[in-house]
Amino acid sequence: MSKLAVSSSFSLLCGNCKRGHVGLECYSDVPTNNLLSNEHLHSLESFVNEVSSEWCCHLVDGNTLAIFLPFDQSTWNLSKGAFVSLLEFCEDNLPIKRILLCLNKINVDETVVSCFKYLGFSPLHPHLYPSCIDSQGVFVMVYSM
């Protein structure tokens, strides 16, 4: 399991991402202290890793969790039950209002979009992306709490 890391300008909630993660063109100015307890951070990391060890997440805009999926969809090894558990954990335990799924815009296919729509996600208009997400290269779906 990867270690948690926290930057001074955004929260990196799991250790799978690198600072130069594709899709993050800047970092939000959200203060990271006291947004989530260490217990919540460790639980969130565990839930994300249960879904896929290839996924990573960032806290952006103070009340939004952005989950970055690997750009190579052939590496996805997903558990629907674990993903639903992740959503339930976020709704019940975290002070967030929405979850963003961030996918490589070039590789998005209708099957993936349909699967996430079935779970309650909807496409987010690029004008509504947080400033730290590259609207040119990333397709975002949103789940509102």
UniProtKB/Swiss-Prot annotation:
Gene3D superfamilies for the chain: 3.40.630.60
The taxonomic lineage of its organism, from the top, reads:
Eukaryota, Metazoa, Ecdysozoa, Nematoda, Chromadorea
GO molecular function list: ornithine decarboxylase inhibitor activity
Q: So what does this one do?
A: Ornithine decarboxylase (ODC) antizyme protein that negatively regulates ODC activity and intracellular polyamine biosynthesis and uptake in response to increased intracellular polyamine levels. Binds to ODC monomers, inhibiting the assembly of the functional ODC homodimer, and targets the monomers for ubiquitin-independent proteolytic destruction by the 26S proteasome.
What interactions and quaternary structure are annotated?
A: Interacts with ODC1 and thereby sterically blocks ODC homodimerization.
**Entry protein name:** Ornithine decarboxylase antizyme
Span-the-membrane segments of this chain are: none
Biological process terms from the Gene Ontology for this record are: positive regulation of protein catabolic process; viral translational frameshifting
This protein's GO cellular component annotations are: cytoplasm; nucleus
Recorded family membership: Belongs to the ODC antizyme family.
Any Pfam family: ODC_AZ
Q: Which SUPFAM superfamilies match?
A: Acyl-CoA N-acyltransferases (Nat) (SSF55729)
